């Protein structure tokens, strides 16, 4: 439902170009939620790895403002990141050294991974529209 709502609202209010920019930049706060969890759960040892991951996803988001495949790849790479957190926090696993990644609320990793997959699939279907919008704006000299 969250992915369907995101698609419906974004298509209702954004042009194709602005939609790409929005979802590319939205990857940054999506990754940033893990910093909020780090603070909330007081996982002091997790700050370095979590902040590094946010920086990596921020690069994908910033590049994705202009390059559609960077948005797709960024959201797809976020899926295993969600899965590792869910597995470590709730399945008794330790895919990474325990305490190096933050805890997450029950089910958050599954929710986020599902959202990321559905949105990446949607972005794949929209990539040609996004490219066409950028080409048209360059041809016409418009910015948005």
Regions found by a protein language model. Give the residues of each.
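Catalytic glutamate of the conserved HExxH
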Residues: 75, 79, 83
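Membrane-interface helix caps and helix-loop-helix hairpins in membrane proteins
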Residues: 13-18, 37-46, 65
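Short, conserved "active-site rim" segments that organize catalytic pockets and cofactor/ligand binding
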Residues: 8
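Membrane-helix boundary elements
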Residues: 25-43
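Hydrophobic core segments of alpha-helical transmembrane domains in multi-pass membrane proteins
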Residues: 49-55, 73-76
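Functional transmembrane or membrane-interface alpha-helices that line membrane-embedded catalytic
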Residues: 1, 11-12, 20-28, 52-69, ...
